[in-house]
Amino acid sequence: MKTYNIVIASDHSGYELKSKIINYLEQKCLNIYDCGTQDTQTVDYPDYAKKVVDIIIEKAAPIGILISDTGIGMSIAANRSSEIRAALCNDILTAENAKAHNDANILILGAKSVDNKIVFNIIDKFLTTKFEGGRHSTRLSKIK
């Protein structure tokens, strides 16, 4: 199976933001796998959350990004798997803590709630922050 740096998907309401994010990440020479959707026709977000989750569980990509209107439904759908730690992040601090303290492996963005002026900063912080381990590992073991 081919491996990727990042797997990404959105529902119809996140399609435009997803397209911008893919362009941004490709400029950074990252290998992106786009699981859809490919237009703004109405689709069901759980189907796209499952695609990203399955790819991460299969270890074909270490990080995922999911986008819907608020991100709440995507968060619920993605977090149904015990191997997934999906975090809804609408600011830089939340993205940093999601990785540093919770070892999040999926970044969830709300297309209607995230500030487009900082969305790339949020993504960069999520991608570059390392898990701190230590007491955070102990806490994570309690929720597996």
UniProtKB/Swiss-Prot annotation:
Q: Does the keyword Magnesium apply?
A: no
Record-linked PANTHER family: DNA DAMAGE-REPAIR_TOLERATION PROTEIN DRT102 (PTHR30345:SF0), RIBOSE-5-PHOSPHATE ISOMERASE B (PTHR30345)
For the protein in the UniProt heading, the enzyme class is: isomerase
Record field: transmembrane: none
Is the Magnesium keyword given for this protein? no
Q: Which GO terms describe its biological process?
A: D-allose catabolic process; pentose-phosphate shunt, non-oxidative branch
Organism equals Rickettsia prowazekii (strain Madrid E)
**What is the name listed in the Swiss-Prot or TrEMBL entry for this protein?**
Putative sugar phosphate isomerase RP299
